[in-house]
Amino acid sequence: MSLHDAYHWPSRTPSRKGSNIKLNKTLQDHLDELEEQFTIPTELLHRVTDRFVSELYKGLTTNPGDVPMVPTWIIGTPDGNEHGSYLALDLGGTNLRVCAVEVQGNGKFDITQSKYRLPQELKVGTREALFDYIADCIKKFVEEVHPGKSQNLEIGFTFSYPCVQRSINDASLVAWTKGFDIDGVEGESVGPLLSAALKRVGCNNVRLNAILSDTTGTLVASNYASPGTEIGVIFGTGCNACYIEKFSEIPKLHKYDFPEDMNMIINCEWCDFDNQHVVLPRTKYDVAIDEESPRPGLQTYEKMIAGCYLGDILRRILLDLYEQGALFNGQDVTKIRDPLAMDTSVLSAIEVDPFENLDETQTLFEETYGLKTTEEERQFIRRACELIGTRSARLSACGVCALVRKMNKPSMIVGTDGSVYNLYPRFKDRLAQAFKDILGEEIGSKVVTIPAEDGSGVGAALVSALEAKGKALTSDILAEHLKN
């Protein structure tokens, strides 16, 4: 549960007309400095987007840079005629989800799902224990949802961990994240590990036929519900995007003899954009977060825009000003020294505080952190949140606009998901404004984000359906089309 979920807000009627309070000189000077560091002017948006476009092109060659542009091997999108029952498996950090999706065509579907807790010991145990547990959950689910069914059921596996994907059904784990630390999986293809476990538990009527990321599922599910969607994006705890590309535009795949006008969904994996620190305007707070992270020097773009980091940026700003004697008047700040003390929901709550004197923010700091705040301090904190949130949205827009420019389309529907996009106040409006600032009013206003369908559930089932229809490339098919 987030801090925002756990916090009980006052029930009295809000009254916010805008505060006329003036900050003292010290706080105002600090605010001016923050505004200079965090404001992303239009000229900088253009430079970041230009750099992004060049990295997209580079990633499609045999010598990619910071944005690897990973082929998903999905060569088609839903055409509305998909029908049938498909399974989906979503392996998260704390839960395992199994879904049965009845695909009904024309954007319609019916979903039944169950969640299973992942015991902590499985996340640090053996690979057999993990995959046997997953297979057993699938078996129990199938017995409940499809009792007595003997014919094979295809299952799509949403495996949102860094992978090298060699075909739709062959993905090797590069490195565990999300608290997993299991020997014998990194460097291995996860498909055979799951298939072997299904056999061990006697689940013989389930066939794994597709492995995908949640971002890929987001695009496919959104395209099914809203035909014409050609980009899928996640702005949540992390960030990523995928899009539909022409085979002729992917030089690193020209060793295969596929038609040049064939489409392929490309998974950008753009969290590492600008690891060389050429254009992104990092502050000292961004640098500190990077240096103290488990992967210093990597994920530069993600660390500036993703929900996993926004709360920590605010926390570091407040501690910095406390150390300089500008905030909290010598109070005990032990609670905000905890690196996990602030998540993005704290910024959201402060930005939507409806009271003129920011009463809810005052109560939040007193009850959660044991800190009394003056109205001046609360106004400063609120403005800091706005700066952090706005920077996130504007830099997020650069990646989307780079894809729009790369695809050279006059308009674009973007299936979008993630907690920041769905829950952060004014993020969508700030994103839309940045589209116009980057692409111009005419084109920018035609880049439309829509709430995505369930990518890791419905999307995985649909990818499984696409594979069954020959719209995704297996290892055998790729071997047949490899040029001599």
Curated annotation (Swiss-Prot):
Pathway, per record: Carbohydrate metabolism; hexose metabolism; Carbohydrate degradation; glycolysis; D-glyceraldehyde 3-phosphate and glycerone phosphate from D-glucose: step 1/4
Protein known as: Hexokinase-1
Pfam family, any one: Hexokinase_1
Residue ranges, annotated region (Hexokinase large subdomain): 213-454
Keyword field: ATP-binding, Glycolysis, Kinase, Nucleotide-binding, Transferase
Consequence recorded when altering residue 213 to N: Increased affinity for D-glucose
Subunit structure: Monomer.
Gene Ontology BP, a term: glucose 6-phosphate metabolic process
Residue sites binding substrate per the record: 160-161, 177-178, 213-214, 240, 269, 302
Record-listed ATP binding positions: 90-95, 237, 307-308, 344-348, 419-423
Domain Hexokinase residue range list: 25-465
Region (Hexokinase small subdomain): 79-212
EC code(s) of this entry: 2.7.1.1
Summary of the function given for this chain in its UniProt record: Catalyzes the phosphorylation of hexose (six-carbon sugars) to hexose 6-phosphate. Phosphorylates D-fructose, D-mannose and, to a lower extent, D-glucose. Compared to hxk2, has low affinity for D-glucose.
EC main group: transferase
GO cellular component, one term: mitochondrion
Species lineage: Eukaryota, Fungi, Dikarya, Ascomycota, Taphrinomycotina
Catalytic reaction annotation: a D-hexose + ATP = a D-hexose 6-phosphate + ADP + H(+); D-mannose + ATP = D-mannose 6-phosphate + ADP + H(+); D-fructose + ATP = D-fructose 6-phosphate + ADP + H(+); D-glucose + ATP = D-glucose 6-phosphate + ADP + H(+)
A molecular function GO annotation: ATP binding
Family under the similarity heading: Belongs to the hexokinase family.
Organism the protein comes from: Schizosaccharomyces pombe (strain 972 / ATCC 24843) (Fission yeast)
InterPro entries: ATPase_NBD, Hexokinase, Hexokinase_BS, Hexokinase_C, Hexokinase_N
